[in-house]
Amino acid sequence: VICTGATLPRDLPIEGRNFKGVHFAMEYLTATTKSLLGEGADSCPISAKDKDVVVIGGGDTGTDCVGSSIRQGCKSVVQLEIMPKLPMDRAADNPWPEWPKVYKMDYGQEEAAAKFGDDPRVYQTTVKKFVADATGAVKELVTVQIKWEKNDKGQFIPVEQAGTEKTIPAQLVLLAMGFLGPEQPLIKAFSVDTDPRSNIKADHGKFNTNVKGVFTAGDCRRGQSLVVWAINEGRG
């Protein structure tokens, strides 16, 4: 039974990506959890204590990064979101019983607002480059605002807005921009089929792959999701 998750993170290949202090979100969250379960928070190899933290990405993983940074005693935290801020009320094309696409604050943002006085999210913003200090560690990043516009094919694409560049201090940058699917070496080793999103192909409820005797469940089958879905499929 293959239950390896969908841990391949989306990267940000821009200038300065390899500076010290720029990490994938799961590197940070995993290290934080292991330190808390082991020797304690002070032993964490990636710590937000007394640092300006920038979280890039607005999903559940980004929220966890915001909350963990605050609990470690960060100096400040900013969460960059490439999408626009959602409306306070449902739009006409988002009726019940559809999932409400409205503005909300999750626990991470609420903790940030309680400590620093405001929602840490900055919307319709992307990162141009990272800037390092003399030791090669990240010290700040340069952002630019974007606007979503339709191209010739009718697809919405992000367009940078001239004159909106801004520098934000950051000694710790956490990349929480989603996941691209499960790690591929093990999948290839078992010769199982994958779907267009590179997840292992198997029907929900049966979980059998194209290879006899090989089954799969959880995020490596359905794609990156919440742990409750993995628990549900494990019980199934």
Model-inferred region functions:
Residues 41-44, 110-120, 124-171:
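A structured beta-alpha segment of the ubiquitous adenosine-cofactor-binding alpha/beta core
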Residues 62-67, 72, 217-236:
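A conserved FAD-binding loop/helix module that cradles the flavin
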Residues 58, 81-85, 132, 219:
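Cofactor-binding loop segments of dinucleotide-utilizing enzymes, especially the Rossmann-like FAD-
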Residues 66-129:
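Rossmann-like dinucleotide-binding cores of NAD(P)H-dependent redox enzymes
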Residues 48-59:
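Beta1/beta-strand and adjacent pyrophosphate-binding region of the FAD-binding site
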Residues 18-50, 149-224:
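FAD-site-proximal beta/loop scaffold in flavoenzymes
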Residues 1-5, 54-56, 127, 169-178:
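Short hydrophobic core segments
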Residues 12-16, 66-68, 185-189, 228-229:
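Short amphipathic alpha-helical segments
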